[in-house]
Amino acid sequence: MGEIRKPIKKSSIEKKNKILEKGFTLMCEKGYHNVNCVDIAKYAGVSTGIIYQYFTDKRDIFIEGVKNYSSKIMFPMIDILDNTKIDKNNLEKILNSMIDSFINTHKMSKKAHEELISMSHIDDEINQIFKDNELKINEKIVNTLKYNNFNVKNLNEKVHIIIGLIDNFCHEIVYHAHKSLNYDEMKKEVINIVLYLLKD
């Protein structure tokens, strides 16, 4: 196997990114263990040899994919925080939007989400990337709230609880779907808990 090269030319960078995007998507859709580099090459429209110019193996592609795309799949609410001024008067509305975004992304990326979680349980490096991303997201939300004058005691810990609460609610809707539960009412309860946690 030849030496792994770092692309410099624009065309080479685009080719590597295409392999990364297509390969990661394919492994998320079909399952990591059901895909090989030949499958990825075919899906990306390149030769297998080209793949080995940029990546060691399919795990290398998956790891890079996790680093580049997992936050968008797992934490879509960040886009809303980046583009919205938050204050105590519009917090409830923003929470509604964040939860809806989280649910929709879980539904659209259901297979990818499942595969990422599955791989995080069996691969220490992927698990560590998730842990690091989780802390970065937590820190970003805390800093955003502080910037918008949410001066709450134990804010770091409360934000961690809030992320877990919203994530659990989304999983309930997307994966469990208990017919005996009213999800509109549950959503209201989730928002009420978050509002309570963020009170001065």
Named regions from a protein language model:
Residues 84, 121-124, 134-159, 200:
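Hydrophobic alpha-helical bundle segments that form small-molecule/ligand-binding pockets
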Residues 107-137:
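Short secondary-structure transition hinges
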Residues 63-69, 129, 133:
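Alpha-helical DNA-contacting segments of helix-turn-helix folds
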Residues 114-116, 147-193:
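Hydrophobic/aromatic-rich alpha-helical bundle segments in the mid-to-C-terminal region
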Residues 14, 18, 22, 26-60, ...:
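Helix-turn-helix
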Residues 1-14:
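N-terminal intrinsically disordered/low-complexity leader segments
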Residues 37, 67-73:
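Short, basic, alpha-helical segments at the C-terminal edge of helix-turn-helix-like DNA-binding modules
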